[in-house]
Amino acid sequence: RIKAWEKVGDLTIIPGDYVNYEYVLNWFVENSKIYDIVKINYDKAKALRLNKELENAGFETNEIRQGFLSLGGPMQNFKEMLLDGKVIFNNSKLYRWYLSNVKLVMDRNSNWMPSKQSKSRKIDGFAASLNSHAEVLNMLVNPVGTGKVTYYSISDLMNM
């Protein structure tokens, strides 16, 4: 399965027993020549060095806190957009595999958080999408009007 994902370009296999962040940094540098990368969101837990390298290379980065409160709203909206067919992932088999590994956990306030179905199941690609969506969500709302709200009291209304 992994070789098939690599063959279609969904996955890059790098040498070694761990992720050498130089490969990730180089991937962003190369792709920034093709795409306008506005900001790179990251999970602080495992990306401290990579984040510094990205900043040194001139990228703007943003930490996305991994919690029910910070990801609950984006998770709900992402799920709705996915069900409405508004999330475009080119029917990638790797991404579908990530989605099949996601288990939604809910806190007592009905905030959702993605979790793995089991330890051997990976959700990294989905988690990266959700981290991006947490930031992009504000860009999806089109402003209406001037944003100014006028307050009228009962007295004001009676005198109009």
Where are these regions (language model features)?
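RNase H-like, metal-dependent nuclease domains and their acidic two-metal-ion catalytic environment used
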Residues: 1-66, 72, 76, 89-160
